[in-house]
Amino acid sequence: MESGSVNDQFTYITLGLFGFYIIYEGLRGRYRDGRKTLKDWQIFGISFAWLQFVERPMLIVCSYFTYRTLMPGLEGNYGHWQDAYLVPLIVAFILIDELLHGSVHYFAHAKRAKNKWLAVIQRWYKGAHRLHHTNGGPDGKGQIGASQTIVVSWGWPFSLPNYWFGTFCLYLGLWEVWIWGTSMKSLWGIHNHANLTYDMTLLKHRSPLISKTMYALCHVFVFPNQHHHHHSRSSNSGKNFQNFIALYDWLLWKKLVISTERPAVYGWRKSEAEETSVLYRFFHRPFMDKWKLGFFKP
């Protein structure tokens, strides 16, 4: 099957599932009573438009010319690997992609780096990631749903190393590996943000075999309630950094949290400017606190 047709099929599947979850959440009343505000929908629209029409094309163009300049001899030379090793390559792609993403995600949530230059980079990631955690109104009733998957402020996707890893795979000619790997991760990420509760039901199942099996699976894969706790306004916001492979949260970051209850409150507290303007919330970036980072003496 041609890579283009495979990509089209996964695009339709992803958009279809995305739309299904949004409609499902609406029918279940997940957007009522302050759970989702007008500003949340506005932010979703801005994020979607910016990602699709500005940032993603810019990433593809910039990464392609970077690779072509630095590694001109590698362009398209490894596509034949897919004929013999497609499944192992997809597994390797997902594991590497998840590790790169989890590393930066962990860095964005960590305490301020002691090295002042690392602190500047970290401040960028913290600011770029903040929008993904600011939802709902000031009443604390806001909840996340499938639409939150794509809520990211400018610069976050462009500066993620796993996105550059993906375009590098494309440059090498590993189209099918990239299509399958990114599609599987996207579908799983949408499912993790959606208001699904099956994982909590299985964790509380009366059968020990079912509950313990689900508990074990939560150490391998990320399920909705694990990611919902990452979006909570609690200490769990600094837990569960992965989108797909929970093994890294468990064995590498030591930040795995498994709960049978939903978070009490979602989202980070917002400043008055963030509460007032969706454009400020999307575009504002405190690049550098010069005094605290030690570049200048007061």
Which residues fall in each region the model found?
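Hydrophobic transmembrane alpha-helical segments in integral membrane proteins
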Residues: 1-18
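Alpha-helical membrane-inserting segments
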Residues: 20-24, 54, 58, 62-70, ...
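Membrane-interface helix-loop junction between the first two transmembrane segments
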Residues: 22-44
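Select subsegments of transmembrane alpha-helices in polytopic membrane proteins
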Residues: 46-60, 146-159
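Membrane-embedded catalytic scaffold of the fatty acid hydroxylase/desaturase
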Residues: 83-268
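A membrane-cytosol interface segment of integral membrane proteins
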Residues: 173, 177, 259-298
